[in-house]
């Protein structure tokens, strides 16, 4: 029964250190394998229009990071795949589940992307299962990520349909208001939901949403994630696609949810909002700091790579990260 499982979130958990076996944090290996490919970090900038664009996607791919291009400029996806392949880079795109997306997937047979993410808010749906099967029939070599979900049953169904990885998280993100608008979601217990889903998974799990600090990446891996999708920590950079806004002499970047009226262009079935984030330097600096912090996490775990994080003990201490405990 669900009511028998412990419920907690990132701020409620502290990982317990083990004896360090490396002489320098720089020796810790933060690389991760997804499908046939290895990447520098187990993190993915959220496939949102204010987080990633083609320029950032290209740069991430060149530097060895994983990315997922958003699906909100449908006509540009095919040229994007071609351009990435011409440079010898992986192509990783998103699709929805509308009828036109079936034709689009079929049209990719001659130049199939390495990764496709089926990206809808409630991924435990027949429409997602049908799309997984369609992609696997038309593009059998393409790695399929499906989501988003929040239960073990959903993970098993999507895996059984052919998904190569599932994305876990229903509304825990900073600009998502699903739990407020609908009463449903994993907001406030995202880490426990991740643990619950990971126990049922046979394939990689991607934790999506609720990441507020770099330490949350290590916690996600401890509780079963292979990779971690992050929105707000990747928003607000100088090169971020979000619109630049000046307020009282200060510079901000817009950051809004994929189900917001700003993304949809209409006030209908809105489950996202828009916020302004202070501009915070370059994306490369954040990626470097994330890697260094994750290397420190590995050193505290007593290992040499990400796998060591999966075996550490932990304690549940309610609201152990609270008043002002931020980077």
From Swiss-Prot:
Stored Gene3D superfamilies: Aldolase class I (3.20.20.70)
**GO cellular component annotations, sorted alphabetically?**
cytosol; GMP reductase complex
Which GO terms of the molecular function aspect are on file?
Answer: GMP reductase activity
The catalytic residues are 176 (thioimidate intermediate)
The record's annotation in PROSITE patterns points to: IMP_DH_GMP_RED
Enzyme class comes to oxidoreductase
Catalytic activity reads: IMP + NH4(+) + NADP(+) = GMP + NADPH + 2 H(+)
Q: Which residues bind NADP(+)?
A: 205-228
The record's InterPro entries line, in alphabetical order, gives:
Aldolase_TIM, GMP_reductase, GuaC_type_2, IMP_DH/GMP_Rdtase_CS, IMP_DH_GMPRt
Q: Which UniProt keywords apply?
A: NADP, Oxidoreductase
Keyword Oxidoreductase among UniProt keywords: yes
Q: What is its EC number?
A: 1.7.1.7
* Any one of the GO BP annotations: purine nucleotide metabolic process
The record's similarity note reads: Belongs to the IMPDH/GMPR family. GuaC type 2 subfamily.
Query: What is the role of the protein in this entry?
Result: Catalyzes the irreversible NADPH-dependent deamination of GMP to IMP. It functions in the conversion of nucleobase, nucleoside and nucleotide derivatives of G to A nucleotides, and in maintaining the intracellular balance of A and G nucleotides.
Xref: NCBIfam families: GMP_reduct_2 (TIGR01306), PRK05458.1 (NF003966)
What is this protein identified as? GMP reductase
